[in-house]
Regions:
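Single conserved hydrophobic/aromatic residue that forms the stacking wall/gate
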Residues: 1-7, 11-14
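Short, conserved micro-motifs enriched in small and acidic residues
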Residues: 2, 26, 142-153, 181-182, ...
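Second-shell loop/turn segments in exported
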Residues: 15-26, 30-32, 71-76, 104-107, ...
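Non-catalytic positions within long, well-ordered alpha-helices that form the structural scaffold/packing
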Residues: 32-39, 267
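Structural recognition of the beta-strand scaffold that forms the well-ordered cores
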Residues: 41-46, 75-77, 117-119, 129-133, ...
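Soluble metallo-hydrolase cores and metallopeptidase-like ectodomains found primarily
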Residues: 61-145, 157-170
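His/Asp/Glu-rich mid-to-C-terminal helical/loop segments that flank catalytic regions of hydrolases
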Residues: 68, 160, 283-336
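Metal-dependent peptidase/peptidase-like ectodomains
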Residues: 73-75, 125, 140, 178-285
Length: 336
């Protein structure tokens, strides 16, 4: 195998073959079919660090993509620093070999997916709900330890803590691990669609999908403020290292389309989705941008004491909402 520099890209060719190289842009396009027919083995493109598993999203989301016209040639995004070394060698007209172990597998769908739902049934208002959620899938080449292990982990621990305490909440508490979040909020949309009659009875959905940093507060409408101040009083006594403040949130514009998290599916339906404000309070120098959808998204990037504190706060606040004598008011959530 040999490689030829093609503009700012490289084209992998059979050793000994003599094909004219064609300049490429970000994605192979110009004469792509002809190059494949001519025997090109693949393409190498420089990619900024960290490498994000987002390059195939245009292909995945293209409605014209079918099982019959999937790519047959590998398109390799290489660490820009490694690429620079190879690029310099090519400019020097040095011969070198590149070896890649490429294992891509396509399976004809549809692919089944499942939400995982657990519940602690309410004793007085079993048909009213508090939801704690995260998403089960990951969209990267790592393990999803952060996105969304930092949501699923505290959710499961909060469930364990509430169950272990023997608490009997007045409202039903649901713990939901949504499937298919990274491919269009599929699990959340399916749940909302099949539970339309329950959406008006959801007091709040606490969705965690943004890294391991711990809760330091929550902002809610004026109509919910007094309830949350009372609910959150025990939170300040958990650990003096972690402050917590309840603030008043200004009315917001009601969303008309979903966003980047499962919570947005419920927000469109008018369900309260007020989540915790978080911060790297102890200065671990965590950067979500450095791991989001990259090979760095590992459980080793997690911060145990942050996760533990998050689980306790989540359990206390969710249980507090579930035990209110009245349903949380939705007054003042949205601008008139």
């Amino acid at each position: 195998m040999t490689s030829s520099l093609v503009g700012s890209e490289m084209c992998i060719r059979d050793r000994g073959a003599h094909h004219k190289t064609i300049p490429l842009r970000r994605m192979p396009g110009l004469f792509y079919k002809e190059m494949c027919e001519a025997g090109v083995l693949g393409f190498i493109q420089s990619a900024s660090v960290p490498l994000r598993a987002l390059y195939d999203r245009p292909l995945v989301n293209d409605k014209n993509t079918t099982f019959d016209n999937l790519p047959e040639v590998c398109d390799i995004k290489l660490d820009e620093h490694q690429y620079a070394v190879i690029e310099q060698m090519a400019k020097e007209r040095r011969e070198f070999w590149l070896e890649f172990d490429i294992r891509n597998h396509f399976k004809l769908g549809p692919v089944k997916y499942h939400n995982v739902v657990a519940s602690i049934k309410g004793t007085k208002y079993p048909d009213e709900y508090v939801i704690i959620s995260g998403h089960l899938d990951a969209f990267d080449v790592a393990t999803g330890g952060i996105d969304c292990g930092t949501g699923i982990g505290p959710m499961m621990e909060a469930a364990r803590l509430i169950a272990l305490s023997g608490a009997k909440p007045k409202r039903t508490i649901l713990f939901i691990a949504f499937a298919g979040e990274e491919f269009g909020l599929l699990g959340a949309k399916a749940y909302a669609r099949t539970h339309q009659n329950e959406l008006g009875k959801i007091a709040n959905l606490f969705n965690r999908d943004g890294g391991p940093t711990p809760p330091i507060g929550i902002s809610v409408p004026q109509a919910m403020y007094d309830d949350f101040v009372e609910i959150c009083k025990p939170v300040k006594n958990i650990n003096p290292d972690f402050p917590f403040e309840v603030k008043v949130a200004k009315p917001r514009k009601r969303p008309t389309s979903t966003g980047g998290t499962d919570a947005s599916v419920f927000a469109v339906e008018g369900v309260p989705t007020y989540g915790f404000t978080t911060d790297d309070i102890k200065g671990y120098n965590f950067s979500y941008g450095e791991i989001w959808h990259t090979e760095r998204d590992l459980y080793t990037k997690n911060i145990p004491e942050y996760q533990e504190h998050t689980a306790v706060v989540t359990a206390i606040v969710a249980l507090g909402v579930a035990n209110l004598d009245k349903q949380l008011s939705r007054e003042g959530m949205y601008k008139e």
